[in-house]
Design a protein with these regions (language model features):
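Conserved AMP-binding/adenylation subdomain of ANL enzymes
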Residues: 60-77, 84-190, 201
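Conserved pre-ATP/AMP-binding loop-to-beta segment of ANL
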Residues: 14-41, 48, 71-77
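Conserved ATP-binding loop and adjacent catalytic segment of the adenylate-forming AMP-binding
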Residues: 105, 177-183, 195-197, 201-208, ...
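Structural core segment of the AMP-binding/adenylate-forming
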Residues: 1-12, 26
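Adenylate-forming
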Residues: 277, 311-340, 369-390, 410, ...
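Conserved C-terminal "lid"/linker of ANL adenylate-forming enzymes
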Residues: 347-350, 402-473
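C-terminal boundary motif of the adenylate-forming
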Residues: 303, 308, 342-368, 407-410
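Conserved ATP-binding/catalytic segment of the ANL
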Residues: 42, 256-324, 341
Length: 473
C-alpha cells in the first residue's frame, strides 16, 4: 500500500477526478502563496545550519523572473546533479522547471555525472566554483599527459582565446585575423574540449555559492561558454544579483535581479529586499530578528560595494575582512580564490588580520600533483609524503609568487602578499569539521584546530609537532 506503480497512481487520480471533479480546484483554493513550500538549511559556514522557511510565492516569483531573465523555455534541457537540499539545485532543477516546463535529467549515479553530461549535452547549467575548478584541473592534467604537438597547439590557441574569446562571446568587434584564428581554435581545440566537458551545447551557465577566481571565470568564457555569475542566498530563494548578457565582468556579480532592492550599509555590509525573502528561520526567532529587519531588509553578512555601472562587487564575508598592522585591508577569500586557480592547489586558508604580513595554509590537489610528480620521477607513499616533498614545496611556492605579483599591482591589497606558507599534512575535510558539506572553509574551527601552526608562521620556528585526529565516514 505504501509503494505504488505509476500506472496505479494515474488510475487512482482518474477515479478521484470522476468522483469529485472539483477536488483539484478546491485544494488549490484552500492554499495560499504564503504557505510554506520548503525548509532548506544554510551551509553552516558561520555556525550551526539554520532552517530557512521559503513560501510558494518565494519560489514561484523568483523562478518566473529567472526564466524570463535568461529566456528559459520548455525546450531547455538541464542536468540535476547537485543535492536538492541545496537551494541552488532546488531552484534551478525544480522550481524553474516547474514554471518554465523544461526537461530535467538526473545522472545515473554520482560516478557517471561527467559521462551523463556528455550524453545529454544540457544547454542550461549551474555549478558552484568548485565544480568548475575540478573540471579545469582535469583538463590541465590531460594536457600535460598529451604529446608535445597537442600541448603546443592547446597553449597557442588558448592564448588566442584569452585575447579575444570573451569579446567574441559578447558580440564585440575583433580583428578579422583574430576571428579566423579563433574559428580554427574552435575546430581543433575549444570544440573538442567543450564536448569532453559536456558543455558543447550550453547556452547559459551560472556559478554561485562561493566567489570564483577571475582567471578561472575568464578561462571558461574564453572557450565560448556563456558562464555568468550570480549572487544569492538561501534566504533570498537564490537571487540577489545576476549578470546580464553583454554585461559580464569577472570581478563583479551583476546588477540587482528583477524586483530586488539593494543597498550598502555604513559598515559596507550588503543588504537586499525582494519577493524571494524568506519567511523565517525555523524555530529560531532570535536569528530571524538578527538577520531580517522589520521592514524586510536582509543582512547578508557580506561586505561589498556597487560600482559606477551599478554592478555589485563582493569583497569577502564582512566578519572576515580585516586590517593588517599597517592599516591596509585584508580580504582572505579574495586571495584564496586566486590561489585556487592553480591546478596544484585544492584549498587555501589565508591569515593576515592584525598581523605584520600574510600567510597561508595550502592543501595540494593530490591528482594534479601526483601527475606532476610522476612526470618528474618523484616517488611517494601517500598524501603526507608527497605534501612534504621539497620539490612540491617549490612547485607551490611558484604559484604563490605569481599570486603575489598580481596582488602587488592592487593598491588596496599589495600588503597582503603571502610571506610564509605551510602545505598541510592532511586534506581539510567536512567529516573533520574543517569544511562545510558544500566545501566552504570554516575559518574559526581551522584557527582553533591548527593554532600551533599559525603561531609558527609568525615566529622563527622551522619545525613544529602536530597531532591530528582524522574521521572516516
Amino acid at each position: 500500500e505504501l509503494v505504488l506503480s505509476f500506472e496505479t497512481l494515474e488510475e487512482r487520480g482518474r477515479q478521484l477526478a470522476e468522483r469529485d471533479p472539483g477536488f483539484l480546484d478546491q485544494a488549490i483554493e484552500k492554499g495560499s502563496g504564503t504557505d510554506t513550500a520548503v525548509i532548506l538549511y544554510t551551509s553552516g559556514t558561520t555556525g550551526t545550519p539554520k532552517g530557512v522557511v521559503l513560501s510558494h510565492d518565494n519560489l514561484l516569483i523568483t523562478s518566473r523572473n529567472a526564466a524570463k531573465f535568461d529566456r528559459i523555455t520548455p525546450d531547455t534541457n538541464s542536468l540535476a546533479y547537485l543535492p536538492m537540499a541545496w537551494v541552488g539545485d532546488n531552484i534551478f532543477s525544480f522550481s524553474e522547471a516547474f514554471v518554465a516546463g523544461f526537461c530535467v535529467n538526473c545522472p545515473e549515479s554520482s560516478a557517471t555525472v561527467m559521462q551523463d553530461m556528455r550524453e545529454i549535452g544540457p544547454d542550461f547549467y549551474f555549478g558552484p566554483p568548485r565544480i568548475f575548478e575540478n573540471l579545469l584541473t582535469m583538463v590541465m592534467i590531460r594536457m600535460e599527459d598529451a604529446g608535445w604537438i597537442k600541448r603546443k597547439m592547446f597553449h597557442y590557441f588558448m592564448g588566442v582565446a584569452r585575447r579575444v574569446g570573451g569579446r567574441i562571446l559578447d558580440h564585440q568587434s575583433v580583428y578579422p585575423w583574430d576571428r579566423l584564428l579563433y574559428g580554427v581554435g574552435e575546430l581543433l581545440v575549444f570544440g573538442p574540449l567543450k564536448n569532453a566537458l559536456g558543455m558543447s551545447r550550453v547556452r547559459v551557465a551560472y556559478t554561485a555559492g562561493e566567489a570564483i577566481g577571475p582567471e578561472l571565470f575568464d578561462f571558461y568564457r574564453s572557450l565560448g561558454i556563456n558562464l555568468k555569475q550570480l549572487y544569492g542566498q538561501t534566504e533570498a530563494a537564490v537571487f540577489v544579483t545576476m549578470q546580464s548578457d553583454g554585461e559580464v565582468r569577472s570581478e563583479t556579480v551583476g546588477a540587482a535581479f528583477p524586483d530586488v532592492e539593494l543597498k550598502i550599509a555604513e559598515n559596507g555590509e550588503v543588504l537586499y529586499r525582494s519577493p524571494g525573502v524568506f519567511q523565517e528561520y525555523y524555530k529560531n526567532p532570535q536569528a530571524t530578528a538578527e538577520t531580517k529587519t522589520p521592514d524586510g531588509w536582509v543582512k547578508t553578512g557580506d561586505a561589498g560595494y556597487v560600482n559606477e555601472e551599478g554592478h555589485l562587487r563582493i569583497i569577502d564575508r564582512a566578519k572576515d575582512v580585516g586590517k593588517m598592522n599597517d592599516g591596509s585591508m585584508f580580504a582572505p577569500k579574495f586571495i584564496e580564490n586566486k590561489l585556487k586557480f592553480y591546478q596544484y592547489i585544492k584549498e587555501a586558508v589565508t591569515f593576515g588580520d592584525q598581523k605584520d604580513y600574510a600567510s597561508a595554509f595550502i592543501n595540494i590537489d593530490l591528482d594534479a600533483v601526483a601527475n606532476w610528480a610522476e612526470r618528474n620521477n618523484i616517488t611517494y607513499g601517500g598524501y603526507q609524503e608527497i605534501a612534504s616533498h621539497d620539490k612540491v614545496r617549490g612547485l607551490i611556492e611558484g604559484c604563490i609568487m605569481e599570486v603575489n605579483e598580481n596582488l602587488a599591482a592592487d593598491s588596496h591589497l599589495r600588503s597582503s602578499q603571502i610571506q610564509r606558507f605551510i602545505i598541510l599534512h592532511k586534506e581539510l575535510d567536512a567529516d573533520d569539521g574543517e569544511l562545510t558539506r558544500t566545501r566552504k572553509v570554516r575559518r574559526r574551527i581551522i584557527a582553533e584546530k591548527y593554532g600551533t601552526l599559525i603561531d609558527a608562521l609568525y615566529s622563527d620556528q622551522q619545525h613544529v609537532k602536530v597531532e591530528s585526529q582524522v574521521t572516516f565516514e
